[in-house]
């Protein structure tokens, strides 16, 4: 029903009111609109992974969270986020953002979290965050930032987490972090930082995480402050190391002493080198002078940031730059010349050259540019030279050059342009030269205007020609009549075998279907076509790409998928894919299925799949993958189905699937899993997750073969000795023999004879100098990105016409100092980018004319130190090097004689004359057969690899046919044998041997021992026609048949009445006492090593000696001196102390730890074991107590004192601080912490005073910390024992559960001088557990990992190890628990890694089998199924059943029931234990069910509970617990 306001009615709306109402409704509608491609839920807008190239419009004004990650956004403009005043979280990571305009975040005053990591930022504008006071977390990691300006973070005063790692930062301005006083996390690792301004981090008192490792810190005097700063904070900044000078390289900065930070000169020491960004600076790798910045050939992959603002020319040619980001040159308004030639540039931002009003020269040739964005040359009114040749440009927009009125030279030579729209060159009013050749022009009616233009303006100087149709092919466009340019349906304009780039005038039409492929709707079918690579151009509307059943071996990172924003499915199955370059799938965020089944992948890493943010199905079946590490699937958070069926997987690293947050189906079948200790985590993981298809089974070890992996018990996952360190790590992308840095591989001086395996496919520089190569490795042609190859100082003697094929990007080739004599005419064919060629130091005499025909870019030729023969045949080379001075004036002529010593560069060409043929040696270098190297009438053939090859006539062989095949020519028959030659080319000879010899050359004596008669172990020795027997010692005779009696009277060797004993090894003499030697002939001098003391005389006796003592001495060895009366008589020193006489006064020398006049008290103890304590039981009056003790430890945590249970006092070491928890009856209990840390290894005095509800804590006499517990007065339980250094397990668990202690670790260190109420305590009156030893000093520096330290051993403190451990520190496992076992009459049987039992022999019993007679075992025949056997005097042997079971043998399981439980719910997060803040009730389901049912929860209750953790953190989480149990179908 419509309401129509009537004139004069008070309820009607006036026109202004009506407009206001309509505007408000429209505003509300706009505020709730959702941008296209995005999802809006409440105040959250999710646009991630949608292929966006710019910030979307119409973002609701009330948005609080905005997800823009995983797109293709390149620039953030000032007004992109205008009006978003309520935004709190902004996610911009994983885009291609190259610039952020200042003021872009000004409206977002509530912004708390901003992530810009994994982008392409090079410059961080100052004051970018000046209005973001609420910003607490900022992530700028993994960008290309090169500097941190002074005002970069000005205004972000609440910033707590700042991540700047993995950038290219080399400059940090002084004061850059000064405003960040609340910062807790700062990461600067993996940058190029060499120095840091003094005190840069001193204003961060809350800093708890700090990373600075993996930089290039130069440790001179300017960095000395950092060493002291790091020493004061030993837990942060770990692994921060010096990179220079050489003497300090590799040392931790914190460990370098102050005196070692030195500067070499006075100027250096005066002040640190300034790092200022106000007007830019010269990049470290470049040279700058007179306004010219020269960065040629420096290996750059991006344009340097923060360049000098006053520069007029920048040279960036011969690098590896891949893109020109937005506004790359806009700040440098004085630029007049830019040279970016010979890079890898494939993309140019539309505003890359914006604002360069003075630019007159722009050089972009030799790149990979395919498209010129609209307006890329806009505003370049002064440009005169534009070189775009040697790219892949396929389309030019008609207005591409509209602002270039002053352009005089335009080169579009060597591109892929098929047509040009009419009017493309209309605005070029000053054009004088135009290069259009080497483009596949289609000369149809659309190109008629160009022919007319070129006839009117004859400025095209390269001879542009038509490529099609056939009737006009190869004809000059400017010379064809206009009427010939026509369009006809009968003619074919597309050139078969090439890509079709025939786009419309706006360059926006989708490309045609790839050659040979079929395109239906949005499906591109390219299967079974024997393709070796993915087609370069695919329609942008493609949703499914089928490339299965081809021969693709490498997936290259070409950026293809960045343009396919609608692609959903890629099928690459049944190819030969063995390598996927990192970044291949960049921009493929829309792809949900990727099939790589039946390929040859051996390993996988996360970089292979980077960009596949929306992937849900990943098929990797039937490959050769052997190992899955925890970086394999990073970033694939949306994958639901992962198939690894039928690979070679033997192990999987823990956490390998943690990043697959959405994973619901995993196929691991048909893999040869090695179920050792490295796979122990997987069984439990499979049981918990229940997402695995089938049951993957173990293949190794043998005893687990074919057992389902999830059924293997945890102890059975074990490693043999030596396998513990073998894990699953990503294969390094560098050969073992080489060193790699980015795309540079250095394999110099490694004695290599072949190319090493594992060279990265994207290598750009390869150094193989100083090795043993004899040929150019054929595999070099597979590395198509090579720009430099160094093969100098090898043994290469020849080149072939295919030595350097497929190296179109090669710019430098070094072949100096080899053995080259001749170079084939086509050796350098296809090297169009080659600029430097070194042939220096070879044996080349001549080069054929035209050898450098393809090397059109060559500017430097090194051919010195070669014997050049300068006749008329080399005249062309002299003229060639003179044009452009390509040779530096080093090469000299070696002949003919009249030209000897003359320079190739400066000698006039007319001097190069022929006066006859050159010498045979010169000619033979390229025609080696001229020198007739083959002997004995052999035929010579030129060979490209072996220089020449001889075909030998019958009867000869060898390289030069120098070896005769007459076998008898060398008199091969020995020992008088006669030689008989055999006929034929490969025939040999035979020998007629004399009697007694045999063999092919009569060299074998006939074996006469075949039928020997030697007996009794005699050894037959062959002679010429006879043999002899070598008899054992006790036999004689010709055949060793007679036994020798060595003990007969005439042969007995024993003397001095020694007894002779015959043995199989001969006679043995048993000597009388006092004699020695083999035959007892030597009289033994017993005084030789006598022990007589104090000048006593030794008297030799029979088999002994006696000592004659000096007067006053006594004892068997005269060791007892005359004894004076000692003052120690009657003095009783206790606890093993010795009494010494000091000034006629007895003094007890106490052992370590004891004190008192008679060493009667134990005052200091050392806790050397991890689980031990002391217990006092007779202490009183706790509510009012004064406790003092001294503590020394290097540990972070440990219990010092504990008394009580519910009402308690607890003193513990927590993270280095002393924590006191005190509960005299009030609730809740309270705790205080010391400000000081005491875990520095020194002794510290801890004083504690309790007075009813008040506690005072003081460290080393400092200011006390006070705590008041207000509440009812209550006296603590004085009967509870006082525990020192730890407590029993049950007390520990109870105290931990009630939060009375935060860390249950026992104390490890030293405690001494414990005073309670001013009374020094005696530790001997305590219950002392093993592992506590007297004294502090001896055991303080000896840590026994699995044992106890004994401080008073003879050699000093020693470790007594637990069973199964050994070594100085009890840290080395011994060979099993049975090593050194104590079984007397029995066999040692291992129970586990550390324990064993004794299996007694018949007739023995006891734990060690040391008791005679077997003891009857009452439980021997009783098998309790669910319980244990117990024997008693009344019942005898009977079963004690486990809960839930009954019956005589505990065989009956109780019916299903629910046992009520009320307790805290606990979980573990990392190293922290977390429990709910209040207890909750639930039931535990136990018992059996009839049939196949299971006892389980029938009714579940879900509650959201708050957890508090032992590390101080808290969180809320939903918990589901059963409230009713019953029988149901098993899950």
Swiss-Prot record:
One of its GO terms (cellular component) is plasma membrane. GO terms for molecular function: calcium ion binding; heparan sulfate proteoglycan binding; Roundabout binding; signaling receptor binding. It is found in: Secreted. Residues 215-265, 439-489, 671-721, 866-916 form the LRRCT domain. Residues 34-61, 273-309, 504-540, 725-761 form the LRRNT domain. Disulfide bonds join 286-295, 443-466, 445-487, 513-519, 517-526, 675-698, 677-719, 929-940, 934-950, 952-961, 968-979, 973-991, 993-1002, 1009-1020, 1014-1029, 1031-1040, 1047-1060, 1054-1069, 1071-1080, 1087-1098, 1092-1107, 1109-1118, 1128-1139, 1133-1148, 1150-1159, 1310-1336, 1339-1349, 1344-1359, 1361-1370, 1378-1388, 1383-1398, 1400-1409, 1419-1429, 1424-1439, 1441-1450, 1456-1495, 1474-1509, 1485-1525, 1489-1527. Residues 1-33 form the signal peptide. Residues 1456-1531 form the CTCK domain. Interacts with GREM1 and ROBO1. This is Slit homolog 1 protein. The gene is Slit1.
